[in-house]
């Protein structure tokens, strides 16, 4: 097996949360920008397909992101290091809740999640030498009842923007959560157990 030199990877994501999680386990990484400029369209269409299950959805998006990152790496003539990608979605009663499109959409999501259990699916993928390995983390999150005033105040904080399900477990939304069953880091956006497995399989040791 060809192993990467220097125990360094590329992260195909702009997410500060995923960067922080990689730093937490001591993984050196560089950011691989998937767009040359913000005005250009994204490489990955994140629209769910008809009848696509939540697991299949995050697997597909992650696989596409990871392989697109590897291709971009080769096109730019950058060092051929592993490319890590991930995708997170929130699922309520089988319905995929992506990132809110606007304030009204965020309010609708939070009202729906109030007092309910939902699932958070995060897939992580690592592409190296043209081979992509995938793992999936599934976590159940239980919200307490959230008042309309709290929803409005939370939206005003700006935290729901660009978050799957319109909330961030590592932020103020932690006050809404009664308990979780599964991976905290998976809900944040990068399940560290599954990520470390992929890294080990590719020849990168966390320890």
Swiss-Prot record:
A Pfam family it matches: Maf
Enzymatic reactions: dTTP + H2O = dTMP + diphosphate + H(+); UTP + H2O = UMP + diphosphate + H(+)
Keyword Hydrolase on entry: yes
CDD domains attached to this UniProt entry: Maf (cd00555)
SUPFAM superfamilies given in the database record: ITPase-like
Cellular component terms per the entry's GO annotation: cytoplasm
Disulphide-bonded residues: none
Function: Nucleoside triphosphate pyrophosphatase that hydrolyzes dTTP and UTP. May have a dual role in cell division arrest and in preventing the incorporation of modified nucleotides into cellular nucleic acids.
Family membership: Belongs to the Maf family. YhdE subfamily.
Protein name: dTTP/UTP pyrophosphatase
Species per Swiss-Prot/TrEMBL record: Nitrosomonas europaea (strain ATCC 19718 / CIP 103999 / KCTC 2705 / NBRC 14298)
């Amino acid at each position: 097996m060809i192993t990467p030199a220097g125990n360094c990877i590329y992260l195909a994501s702009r997410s500060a949360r995923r960067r922080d999680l990689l730093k937490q386990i001591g993984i050196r990484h560089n950011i691989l920008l998937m767009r040359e400029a913000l005005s250009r369209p994204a490489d990955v269409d994140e629209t769910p397909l008809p009848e696509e299950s939540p697991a299949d959805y995050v697997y597909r998006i992650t696989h596409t992101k990871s392989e697109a990152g590897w291709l971009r790496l080769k096109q730019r003539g950058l060092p051929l290091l592993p490319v890590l990608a991930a995708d997170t979605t929130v699922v309520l009663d089988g319905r995929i809740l992506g990132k809110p499109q606007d304030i009204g959409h965020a309010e609708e999501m939070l009202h729906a999640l109030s007092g309910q259990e939902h699932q958070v699916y995060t897939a992580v993928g690592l592409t190296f030498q043209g081979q992509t390995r995938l793992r999936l983390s599934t976590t159940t999150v239980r919200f307490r009842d959230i008042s309309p005033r709290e929803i409005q105040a939370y939206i005003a904080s700006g935290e729901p923007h660009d978050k799957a399900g319109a909330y961030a477990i590592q932020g103020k939304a932690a006050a809404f959560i009664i308990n979780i069953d599964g991976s905290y880091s998976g809900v944040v956006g990068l399940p560290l157990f599954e990520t470390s497995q992929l890294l080990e399989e590719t020849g990168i040791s966390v320890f």
